[in-house]
């Protein structure tokens, strides 16, 4: 029977929503204040859940040191105190929109790739604040 473990990581980052091919007026109509040219920031909370069998010797489903190293490299180092649109190439103009949904999916892909066969990531939740959380769960 699988067990689950969730590790939380936080980061502060700025972003805005904008589609380069659209006029400023259309971006403002669709994205509202989130399309403002000077960006805006959040104190993000990201919960990454992994699953696996409990090791009969260690009692763990994953080595927390390894998981923490991956989260530091793939999440905190990439996003903390960054402008997501400008500093994370995948989210630049014409790339991914820096929504909570896209951040959750992107973080899932990066963390799962880094962990490889060690464990399976089953859920990534990204909260911009206490009232809004986006969740990605792979099929």
Question: How does the language model describe each region?
Answer:
Residues 1-139:
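Charge-rich, low-complexity N-terminal segments
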């Amino acid at each position: 029977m699988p067990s689950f473990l969730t590790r939380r990581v936080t980061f502060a980052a700025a972003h805005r929503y904008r589609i380069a091919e659209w006029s400023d007026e259309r971006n403002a109509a669709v994205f509202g204040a989130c399309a403002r040219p000077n960006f805006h920031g959040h104190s993000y909370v990201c919960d990454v859940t992994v699953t696996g069998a409990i090791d009969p010797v260690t009692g763990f489903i994953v080595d927390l040191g390894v998981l923490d190293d991956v989260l530091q490299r793939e999440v905190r180092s990439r996003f903390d105190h960054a402008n997501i649109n400008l500093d994370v190439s995948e989210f630049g103009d014409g790339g991914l929109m820096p929504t909570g949904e896209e951040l959750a999916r992107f973080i899932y892909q990066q963390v799962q790739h880094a962990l490889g066969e060690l464990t399976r990531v089953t859920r990534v939740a990204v909260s911009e604040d206490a009232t809004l959380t986006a969740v990605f769960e792979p099929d």
